[in-house]
Curated annotation (Swiss-Prot):
Species of provenance: Roseobacter denitrificans (strain ATCC 33942 / OCh 114)
Binding residue positions for ATP: K240
Assembly notes: Homodimer.
PANTHER family tied to this protein: TYROSINE--TRNA LIGASE, MITOCHONDRIAL, TYROSYL-TRNA SYNTHETASE
Entry keywords, A to Z: Aminoacyl-tRNA synthetase, ATP-binding, Cytoplasm, Ligase, Nucleotide-binding, Protein biosynthesis, RNA-binding
GO biological process: tyrosyl-tRNA aminoacylation
Pfam families: tRNA-synt_1b
Catalytic activity, EC: 6.1.1.1
GO molecular function (one): tyrosine-tRNA ligase activity
InterPro entries with a match to the protein in the record: aa-tRNA-synth_Ic, Rossmann-like_a/b/a_fold, S4_RNA-bd_sf, Tyr-tRNA-ligase, Tyr-tRNA-ligase_bac-type, Tyr-tRNA-ligase_bac_1
Protein name: Tyrosine--tRNA ligase
Length: 416
């Protein structure tokens, strides 16, 4: 991309690696020079927390605000009832209103760590598309909105085409998601003057639909900008750790686990992740990313500290770093290790070490836990576990025990 940006936001997006594509580079750039502009990202409420795969979009909104503009975080209280089919191999399970509301409440906790929701001109707004989608009249919607969409064109979008090419069913319900998301963009332009939708590159088709609809119905000049769908240097999708999803809510993935996830970054990804997930100056990101050998570990600790501070605060980051030092350098336990608390009833008949490894989050299944033990990858209180049939009773838990999977993942087990 040879375009040289004039606005601060576009300059940051391009310099730090956030930019995958834009519907009109020059048009958006010039619009952002005209004063405070609103932009939005939509987040469907399919779980009680977002995971780290959404963090690149949250950072885009943070930079949008830091460069003088107004972020809109749109909760999909309406669209979650339908489900986004983009690049999915199957249909999402449908959630009821109560589950969606509970999920929205959980997701909201994350945003205030990154975005200011004050009454300032650039203060963010938290919105819910159920406000306008829940009360739509179906026949009116078909007549006024549906006529602007070409089925031929919608079938050509890669997100739909890839599903159909695999001969996997795409329900009419899911197909309508694209129309509803397009309607969201138009409604946000009408209500708030929102000129920009941000999203991952898998949302390109949905974003383009919204731009076309807004121009056709109310002659609004709006834009779309997408970020790359991130994978690690070894081809793995961002959002997963060895123990499962990397959630952003502390009650679902502890600050220590979050810190450790970033500390375990592959050497080749350090520089790129520093640019995307921290606010360190670019030259410092490049310097740290260029370190080699044992020196790269210092860069990984900086990455873990910076990202954890943004989400969970400086105190939580410092505690996580200290716990890591206690565990890895001093052979101790640490105050912030993930902890599984069992009741006396849980261990009345004894509980197998395999179950404990799974319950503590160190393995996703009994099969994986047994493999860890068989391959000498599991330890209890730093002693190798060799017996997958070992039973743990209340007497063994009079003092907390430390379980380890490999060198980097640890958890405490205690009686409550």
């Amino acid at each position: 991309m040879t375009y040289i940006p004039k606005s601060d936001f576009m300059a940051v997006m391009m310099a730090r690696g956030f930019m995958a594509d834009c519907t009109d580079y020059q048009g958006l750039d010039e619009a952002l020079l005209k004063g405070v502009q609103p932009a939005y990202i939509g987040f469907d409420a399919t779980a009680k927390s977002l995971h780290v795969g959404s963090l690149i979009q949250i950072m885009m909104l943070r930079w949008f605000q830091k460069t003088g503009h107004k972020p809109l975080t749109l909760m999909g209280g309406g669209t979650t009832k339908v489900g986004d089919p983009s690049f999915r191999a199957d249909e999402r399970p449908l959630l009821g209103p109560e589950a969606i509301d509970d999920n929205i409440a959980g997701i909201k906790q994350v945003f205030s760590a990154y975005i200011d929701y004050s009454d300032a001109p650039t203060g963010a707004l938290m919105l819910n598309n159920a406000e306008w989608l829940d009360n739509l009249n179906y026949l009116d919607f078909l007549r006024d909105i549906g006529r602007h969409f070409s089925i031929n064109r919608m079938l050509s979008f890669e997100s739909v085409k890839s599903r159909l090419d695999r001969e996997q069913s795409l329900s009419f319900l899911e197909f309508n998601y694209m129309i509803l998301q397009a309607y969201d963009f138009m409604e946000l332009y009408r209500r708030y003057g929102c000129i920009l939708q941000l999203g991952g590159s898998d949302q390109w088709g949905n974003i383009v639909n919204g731009i076309d609809l807004t121009r056709r119905v109310i002659d609004g000049e709006v834009y779309g900008l997408t970020s790359p769908l991130l994978t690690t240097s070894d081809g793995k999708k961002m959002g997963k750790s060895q123990s499962g999803a990397v959630w952003l809510n502390a009650d679902m993935f502890s600050p220590y686990e979050f810190w450790q996830f970033w500390r375990n970054t592959t050497d080749a990804d350090v520089g790129r992740f520093l640019k995307l997930y921290t606010e360190l100056p670019l030259d410092e990101c490049e310097r740290l990313g260029a370190l080699a050998g044992s020196e790269i570990n210092a860069a990984k600790i900086t990455l873990a500290n910076e990202v954890t501070t943004l989400l969970h605060g400086a105190e939580a980051a410092a505690t996580a770093a200290q716990t890591a030092r206690d565990v890895f350098e001093k052979g101790g336990v640490g105050d912030d290790l993930p902890t599984l608390t069992l009741s006396a009833e849980d261990v009345a008949q004894g509980i197998s070490i395999v179950q404990l490894i799974v319950k503590s989050g160190l393995a996703n299944s009994g099969k994986e836990a047994k493999r860890l033990i068989a391959e000498n990858g599991a330890k209890m209180d730093d002693a190798p576990l060799t017996n997958a049939g070992l039973m743990i009773d209340a007497a063994a838990l009079q003092s907390p025990i430390k379980l380890s999977a490999g060198k980097k993942r640890h958890a405490m087990v205690q009686l409550g």
